[in-house]
UniProtKB/Swiss-Prot annotation, chain A:
Protein's name according to its UniProt entry: Peptidoglycan recognition protein 1
Taxonomic superkingdom: Eukaryota
Pfam families for this protein: Amidase_2
Disulphides: 17-141, 33-78, 54-60
Natural source organism: Mus musculus
Swiss-Prot record, chain B:
Cysteine pairs bridged by disulfides in the record: 41-113
Annotated glycan sites: 191
UniProt-recorded name of the protein: Triggering receptor expressed on myeloid cells 1
Gene3D superfamilies named in the record: Immunoglobulins (2.60.40.10)
Gene behind the chain: Trem1
Length: 182, 230
């Protein structure tokens, strides 16, 4: 009985978000965004960058900077569009995070969702298993910290906008996730 | 060993029945008379951008009542007003927004957004909405009405980019409705709590019905196999 209680307590502790690579670590430019997200968030939108992939911490940190540079300097946005970026090195990179509204989907969805992108193009291949694990861990820690509703729903980018994102293969994977709802 | 296998099958039937019968949790909205209910119902853009959507009321033990529907062409953003009901349809953003203004206690009940495509079963969007409207106490607040526009007896059907030629879906209203804009109230909905109730009676009924029919099939198969091999 005592053992069961201890085990349950450990499970509760296990879902912290400390595995996320913070902005300072991947040397992000400062954010100029100010619109906040209300918590808990009900929707998660999964996309892909359709750009280069990366499979090491060095190359993924560089890729995250590249994406941010494109969004800030080319597109003129206040920051990288996504709330989180997933690298095929198996790490989660902090974008706008849990508290700031992203620019990942559209004017209706951005204020009511967390946008998670996989760095790469996943039309013809699935992301590395560690990348998928990282995303699921991120979602689990989001729920345990109260950023996501416990009955949150995952949508593919193409479910809510006219786009190919997150790519045929990644889309097929997320459709098998427990919280996916078309 | 065959007996164990057969009991295993029975278990599978039971489990699959319960899974199939799990309905969407209700989302509860607690509001006060005079307030506005706003519900956002997303739909799948690939499957339903061009489908008709509706807001329905679900009276206890009766057929769903369709209150307001989106108007053709469904491919363009549109706004439909039907008395206190407003449907804002944005097919490019995959969102249907429902508003019910000037809520009364009698508006309390169960509602839902659906993809409306008879004779097919409607597809429920978002969650069933459990609306609970209570009388506001006089010292809490009164809605600031700026301004009130008195409408005529006839129902209003406003669609952007499209002049309505089909008026058969409108209902005539018995009294004038007022469009109340209450900007001072700010947030118009309170998000439902996480601990929402599942309508257990409907789950139980569908589980039992399914179980009975599956048990019947199981029994028949059992008898047939016994006869063949027994």
């Amino acid at each position: 009985m005592l053992f069961a209680c201890a085990l349950l307590a450990l499970l509760g502790l296990a879902t912290s978000c400390s595995f996320i690579v913070p902005r300072s670590e991947w040397r992000a430019l400062p954010s100029e965004c100010s619109s906040r997200l209300g918590h808990p968030v009900r929707y998660v939108v999964i996309s892909h960058t359709a750009g280069s992939f990366c499979n090491s911490p060095d190359s993924c940190e560089q890729q995250a900077r590249n994406v941010q540079h494109y969004h800030k300097n080319e597109l003129g946005w206040c920051d990288v569009a996504y709330n989180f970026l997933i690298g095929e090195d198996g790490h989660v990179y902090e974008g706008r995070g849990w508290n700031i509204k992203g620019d990942h989907t559209g004017p209706i969805w951005n204020p009511m969702s967390i946008g998670i992108t996989f760095m790469g193009n996943f039309m013809d291949r699935v992301p590395a298993k560690r990348a998928l694990r990282a995303a699921l861990n991120l979602l689990e820690c989001g729920v345990s910290r109260g950023f996501l509703r416990s009955n949150y729903e995952v949508k593919g980018h193409r479910d809510v906008q006219s786009t190919l994102s997150p790519g045929d293969q990644l889309y097929q994977v997320i459709q098998s996730w427990e919280h996916y709802r078309e | 060993m065959r007996k164990a296998g057969l009991w295993g099958l029975l278990c599978v039937f039971f489990v699959s029945e319960v899974k199939a019968a799990i309905v969407l949790e209700e989302e509860r909205y607690d509001l006060v008379e005079g307030q506005t209910l706003t519900v956002k119902c997303p739909f799948n853009i690939m499957k339903y951008a061009n489908s008709q959507k509706a807001w329905q009321r679900l009276p206890d033990g009766k057929e769903p009542l369709t209150l307001v529907v989106t108007q053709r062409p469904f491919t363009r953003p549109s706004e439909v007003h039907m008395g206190k009901f407003t449907l804002k349809h944005d097919p490019s953003e995959a969102m249907l927004q429902v508003q019910m203004t000037d809520l009364q206690v009698t508006d309390s009940g169960l509602y839902r957004c659906v993809i409306y495509h008879p004779p097919n079963d409607p597809v429920v969007l978002f969650h069933p909405v459990r609306l609970v409207v209570t009388k506001g106490s006089s010292d809490v607040f009164t809605p600031v009405i700026i301004p009130i526009t008195r409408l005529t007896e006839r129902p209003i059907l406003i669609t952007t980019k499209y002049s309505p030629s089909d008026t058969t879906t409108t209902r005539s209203l018995p009294k004038p409705t007022a469009v109340v804009s209450s900007p001072g109230l700010g947030v118009t909905i309170i998000n439902g709590t996480d601990a929402d109730s599942v309508s257990t009676s409907s789950v139980t009924i569908s589980v039992i019905c399914g179980l009975l029919s599956k048990s019947l099939v199981f029994i028949i198969l059992f008898i047939v196999t016994k006869r063949t091999f027994g």
